Regions:
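Active-site metal-binding loops of divalent metal-dependent hydrolases
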Residues: 17-19, 42-44, 70
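Alpha-helical scaffolding within the catalytic cores
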Residues: 21-26, 48-56
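Active-site metal-binding motif and surrounding structural segment of the metallo-beta-lactamase
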Residues: 31-39, 43
């Protein structure tokens, strides 16, 4: 399931929560709400880089993704570790993937372009 939040600047965010990949991601989140930014909880062992990539590239098709709740040491000093599951996800995406880094605030415009706080 998850949550959809719409902001007054036009940004529509889908918070996946701990949900798995499901067909409503296309019909409800992608087609109806037209989410342009997804906060993808990627830590579950049930969600592989391949299934998450399919959900983002084929079902929701957001402008950008924030990988969160990854349950691994995906970064060192704020930089992506190339051997991580998260790095595999980033390589397969057709859109920018931003990393949720503790203490870092990210700002997005209405089209899900990161305007501050992203690398």
């Amino acid at each position: 399931s998850g949550y959809v939040i719409k902001f007054t600047n036009g940004l529509t965010v889908y918070l996946s929560g701990d949900t798995g990949i499901h067909t409503e991601m296309k019909s409800v989140v992608g087609d109806f709400h037209k989410a342009n930014l997804v906060l993808l909880n990627y830590g579950s062992s049930a969600i592989s880089a391949y299934s998450a990539t399919y959900a983002m590239n084929e079902l929701i098709k957001p402008s950008a993704v924030i990988a969160t709740h990854v349950n691994e040491r995906a970064t060192t000093s704020g930089k992506l570790r190339p051997e991580s599951r998260t790095a595999a996800l980033v390589k397969m995406q057709k859109r920018p993937v931003h990393l949720a880094i503790s203490g870092r605030t990210m700002e997005f415009d209405g089209k899900a372009n990161c305007v501050a706080g992203c690398n």
